[in-house]
């Protein structure tokens, strides 16, 4: 099993959108894929699959607090694909509780091992909370690869430098994904500058898309609804490179 974390230093850069679409593409290619929402502060993945789960259904929060086995959290959002989703709780009380965690986050390590043994996945994708904190470092430590998602602005650049350094100290391979870039940006030049500045590869670059932004307002998977779009082709290339 290859564990891939999607992370960003700042919120709102499209990290969850990338995670959901990549998980779908990997599963559509026949790869057994688990997508786990470890962004306990602001969970979002259920929206992309338009799941209507009962609020009492177990989530990752329940596993981390010892209230439920991790295997009971797994759901299959698209029945004809080998894709499994482990959602985080969207209950307001649980999101507030996550700000002052009362559980041992190292329990996640045991959960990952149990998922590997029970489901034998090819890929486990972790949609991580943005920023630098104890939970993000723990999640990074279980990964083989980190996709650090950023936008083309100074604050993103500074924060990304920090996160790339953390990944290297944890001996986890970092790759960059530039998202929502202005349409007039010279992407080849920016790619060269990013790779030189951070000394790591740029795995993909995506320009701003009004179509994707509009879909984000109602939910759904962009690559599933727009398989021939240019962004979908770049997402497919990124998925194949993993």
Predicted regions and their residues:
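Acidic-aromatic/histidine active-site loop/patch
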Residues: 1-3, 241
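Walker A/P-loop NTP-binding active-site region of P-loop NTPases
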Residues: 3-69, 123
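P-loop/Walker-type NTP enzyme "switch/lid" segment
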Residues: 40-116, 216-218
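Short, hinge-like loop/turn segments at secondary-structure boundaries
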Residues: 51-55, 166-167, 192-195, 220-223
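Conserved catalytic-core segment of NTP-binding enzymes
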Residues: 107-205, 213-214
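C-terminal boundary of histidine-terminating zinc-finger modules
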Residues: 216-235
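C-terminal alpha-helix
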Residues: 234-242
């Amino acid at each position: 099993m290859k564990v891939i974390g999607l992370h960003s230093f700042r919120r709102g850069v499209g990290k969850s959108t990338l995670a959901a679409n990549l998980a779908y593409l990997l599963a559509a290619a026949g790869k057994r894929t688990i997508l786990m929402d470890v962004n306990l502060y602001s969970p979002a993945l259920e929206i992309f699959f338009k799941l209507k789960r009962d609020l009492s259904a177990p989530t990752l929060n329940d596993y981390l607090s010892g209230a439920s086995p991790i295997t009971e959290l797994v759901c299959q959002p698209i029945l004809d694909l080998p894709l499994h989703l482990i959602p985080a709780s969207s209950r307001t009380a649980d999101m507030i509780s996550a700000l002052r965690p009362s559980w041992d986050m190292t329990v996640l390590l045991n959960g990952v091992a149990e998922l590997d043994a029970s489901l034998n996945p090819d890929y486990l994708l972790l949609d991580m909370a943005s920023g630098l904190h104890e939970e993000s470092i723990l999640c990074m430590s279980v990964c083989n690869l980190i996709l650090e998602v950023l936008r083309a602005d100074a604050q993103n650049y500074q924060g990304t430098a920090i996160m790339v350094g953390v990944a290297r100290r944890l001996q986890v391979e970092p790759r960059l994904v530039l998202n929502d870039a202005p349409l007039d940006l010279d992407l080849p030049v920016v790619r060269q500058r990013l790779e030189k500045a951070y000394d790591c590869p740029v795995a993909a670059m995506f320009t701003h898309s009004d179509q994707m932004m509009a879909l984000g307002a109602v939910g759904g998977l962009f690559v599933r609804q727009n398989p021939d779009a240019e962004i979908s082709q770049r997402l497919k290339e990124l998925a194949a490179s993993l």
